[in-house]
Amino acid sequence: MLRITELKLPIDHPDEDLRAAIVQRLGIASDELLDFTLFKRSYDARKKSSELCFIYTIDLSVRDEAPLLLKFADDRNVNPAPDVSYKVVGQAPANLSQRPIVVGFGPCGIFAGLLLAQMGFKPIVLERGKEVRQRTKDTWGLWRKSVLNPESNVQFGEGGAGTFSDGKLYSQIKDPQHHGRKVLHEFVKAGAPDEILYVSKPHIGTFRLTGVVENMRQQIIALGGEVRFEQRVTDVLIEDGQLQGVELASGEQLHSRHVILALGHSARDTFRMLHSRGVYMEAKPFSVGFRIEHPQSLIDSARLGKYAGHPKLGAADYKLVHHAKNGRSVYSFCMCPGGTVVAATSEPNRVVTNGMSQYSRNERNANSGIVVGITPEVDYPGGPLAGIELQERLESHAFVLGGSNYQAPAQLVGDFIAGKPTTALGLSLIHI
């Protein structure tokens, strides 16, 4: 198997041109190319003066590989394809005495449960929120009627916070063992579009994610696992310094020496419980800021120039950063093309915002987080839970500023820069 990188074609090229370009790049006859797979497709729109092209990475099989490797020995864009297959790390023993427990059924909990089930461990997954379709109804209750269910909302429930976001599937974390390919293949197996396997910034979209996470849950169950909703963990069972299991809000105790805490970032009551039980934890840096919203057409024109609106490119995104002289950095985060700003709180009398896009990304406006990094050493000294306490103060203050009805306070950017209040907003698509 060979890999070609940096193979460029015009964005309007017919599908059959890709095979022809591979053959031409390698200098082989068409019948020598046995098969090829699209591994990645991206584009670079930074140079507005040049014609926009798709940039491909292709994995392929040829009739006689050795001569081609020798021929392109000095070409950094033609190499043996790396092995990106997932290597199973273990298998459950035949005499499995205790099933592992997974706490939380967001992205981490889903894949922890799925991988354990695939290895025969028959995990018990505990999720404090509801199954995804009932959770969706509760979430719309907050958006439309300002009625918050603290256990079923944007943060808690099947699929986790990512279900009501953009369904983004890319990360800046290096992945030398290609574990990300396993994740993408499992999503496709569960009903996500095939294109997430090769587009440079794959996303599924909120509405599609509901069916995908349901299918992944059914896979876990079919393999002998168990997924239980509305099961909030209130304590961990510890004897002689050894974990023995968990206790639920109902009083039920589940015993296991193996518990995975896939809590996400909003289970503050669970963090406090763990801290009180002597579980080691430390404060970490995080970022805080606001959501900015602007017309998607403005972003398309700025990023794509004359190609704005091209059907093969879709809605444009952006990523911006500013490094201030005082050492802090302000940057865009979780940019949602063609999406909406949504209320994302899970706690009474607090306001949190997030961004959300559907698969089509065809709403009028784009939005992004604009955040600044803060650290425990400078901004919230006082112990491992001091950052949570800072978040709670900010969220409570935002709740009051927004009218004490779960609507977020909003301000025009020009007014923010000028330091004056906003009296009227433009066209906005917000669920806050």
Q: Over which residues does each language-model region extend?
A:
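Residues forming the flavin
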Residues: 1-52, 58-429
